[in-house]
Design a protein with these regions (language model features):
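Gly/Pro/Ser/Thr-rich low-complexity, intrinsically disordered segments predominantly at protein N-termini
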Residues: 1-196
Length: 196
């Protein structure tokens, strides 16, 4: 008995975008391959109530703060596109801010300046490693924020001239600040209605 191997077909970014328009399950794209978001269970079942509340709290405050300004906040159905050395990635951040209208397409953004990911057990490792490294390739990005959903803890990566700086906000009295947007948000508001 011989083992059979499946050959994965390379999918172009254009094919992926067209497939995603008609898919019942959201997928992320990496260099010609597509992957269900987090896992098939997460992609089909969706995120937890806490995840949605946290992302919604952050989005609603950003959206209100940016009203009438050149920057705009988007929620989890808007993809971000990364292109580097001939490879393409498409991810669905939980929240992102774009300040460059030229980088905004109908279904994705190429120039986010802020990206927020709310961590879940199924996605935390990917958000902390793979996505962080990919997002750091976006020239316009200056702030990448990771928000725990099971404890009051926020990790912020900020672009500095030669590297990225990491900052932790583990305390109740802390405030998340994004100076480039003249925006600040307390952990109490971020974690409102979560019981944390």
């Amino acid at each position: 008995m011989s083992a059979t191997t499946k050959t994965k077909r390379w999918i172009s970014p254009e094919e992926y975008l067209e497939m995603e328009l008609h898919s019942e399950v959201r997928h992320e794209y990496f260099a010609g391959e597509i992957f269900p978001m987090g896992s098939e269970t997460v992609a089909m079942a969706g995120a937890s109530v806490e995840h949605n509340r946290i992302a919604g709290n952050i989005f609603s405050e950003l959206h209100a703060h940016l009203r009438g300004k050149r920057c705009e906040a988007f929620m989890n159905d808007m993809k971000t596109h990364i292109h580097d050395q001939g490879d393409d990635w498409f991810y669905y951040p939980d929240v992102m801010v774009n300040c460059n209208p030229a980088g905004q397409q109908k279904y994705f953004c190429e120039t986010p300046s802020v990206i927020v990911e709310v961590l879940s057990p199924a996605t935390e490792a990917t958000d902390r490693r793979e996505k962080r490294l990919a997002y750091e390739m976006i020239p316009a990005l200056h702030t990448y924020i990771l928000v725990a959903q099971d404890r009051r803890e926020i990790t912020i990566f900020r672009r500095a001239p030669e590297r990225w700086l990491r900052e932790e906000l583990p305390d109740d009295g802390e405030v998340l600040r994004v100076p480039e947007l003249d925006f600040s948000l307390s952990l109490d508001v971020i974690y409102a209605r979560t019981g944390l």
